Structure formats: structure tokens, C-alpha cells
């Protein structure tokens, strides 16, 4: 029952994951969507950090539940694609959402505390693997003979890789003052 209910609201939850930072940011003085990652809204100095951290955990749990429904559907077509897609989504839900919500990061990306290290490594691994999801979705669509959605998924995969690469490059000193330095923008675009 809850799985069927959740599948109807998953698109809303995915949209909220991008919208909630825009709703919370006005309460955090000097927060910049273009240059700062969303996790900064969960650090202890952010006025509404508890709301953001609770959201991340709830969102991660919702993704896990919906993935349990997705797995058998994809497995009917290909068990290997299903396992790979399930794995990357679960790792993102746990590392990029649940652990990131439980273990806050500081205002900067320095990994000085155990909490910041767990958050940093969990979210990097989660986001990195999430970039592979459109590839597996594309393979699934090709298997079910839906070439158009397969091609669109592969295009999304290419964009995800490009945006993730820009996200990783954004904090490097060589790119300071350039469009590549828009770390927050690249993070958000990699999630689309």
C-alpha cells in the first residue's frame, strides 16, 4: 500500500528536493545558490538546518522505499540492469541523503570532524554513482524497445556526467572567478 502511494508522489518528492533549498536559503544570510552546495543549509549555523537535515533523511527513506518497488519491475526485463540501477539508487539514498542528513557538514568543505567526513564521503560516493542511473535507465528502455526514451536517457547521462565533472572542478583554485566556480549550480543541474 505505502509503496503504491509513494510511487505517485515520487515526482513531487524529486521536485521538492530541488525546491526546499530555495525556500530555506532566504533565512541563511549570505547563502548563494550559485556558489554554495545545498548541504551548507544543513550545517549547524544555518537557522533552519534541522528542517533541511530531516528532509534529507525523509527523502532518502522515500527513495529507498520507491526503489524496492522499482526493482521487480526492471528485473522482469533484465536482472543485471535492475541490480545495477537498484545499487546506485540505494547508495545515493543512503550516502547522499540519509547519512548527509544525520551527519552535518560545516560551512566549508573542510573535512575536519568525523561528521563532516562521513557527510563528505557519503555524498560524493552517492552523487557520483547517481550519475550512472540515467545510463541504466537508458539500457532498460532499449531492452523494452523504447528507443526514444533510451536515447533521451543517454542524453541525460551525458549531461549528468558533464555537470558532475563541473561540480567537482568548481572548488579548484584554477577556476575561481570563472563560470566553472558555480559549484551550487552544477550540483543542482547534476540532479536534474
PLM segments and residue spans:
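Hydrophobic, aromatic-enriched alpha-helical segments typical of multi-pass transmembrane helices
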Residues: 2-31, 37, 41, 45-192
Amino acid at each position: 500500500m505505502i509503496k503504491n502511494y509513494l510511487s505517485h508522489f515520487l515526482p513531487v518528492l524529486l521536485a521538492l528536493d530541488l525546491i526546499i533549498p530555495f525556500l530555506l536559503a532566504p533565512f541563511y544570510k549570505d547563502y548563494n545558490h550559485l556558489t554554495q552546495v545545498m548541504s551548507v543549509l544543513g550545517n549547524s549555523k544555518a537557522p533552519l538546518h534541522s528542517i533541511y537535515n530531516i528532509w534529507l533523511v525523509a527523502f532518502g527513506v522515500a527513495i529507498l522505499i520507491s526503489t524496492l518497488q522499482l526493482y521487480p519491475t526492471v528485473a522482469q526485463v533484465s536482472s543485471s540492469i535492475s541490480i545495477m540501477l537498484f545499487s546506485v539508487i540505494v547508495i545515493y539514498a543512503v550516502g547522499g541523503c540519509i547519512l548527509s542528513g544525520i551527519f552535518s557538514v560545516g560551512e566549508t568543505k573542510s573535512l575536519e570532524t568525523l561528521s563532516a567526513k562521513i557527510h563528505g564521503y557519503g555524498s560524493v560516493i552517492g552523487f557520483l554513482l547517481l550519475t550512472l542511473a540515467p545510463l541504466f535507465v537508458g539500457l532498460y528502455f532499449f531492452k523494452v524497445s523504447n528507443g526514444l526514451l533510451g536515447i533521451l536517457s543517454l542524453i541525460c547521462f551525458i549531461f549528468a556526467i558533464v555537470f558532475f565533472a563541473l561540480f567537482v572542478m568548481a572548488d579548484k583554485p584554477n577556476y575561481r572567478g570563472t563560470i566553472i566556480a558555480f559549484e551550487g549550480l552544477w550540483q543542482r543541474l547534476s540532479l536534474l
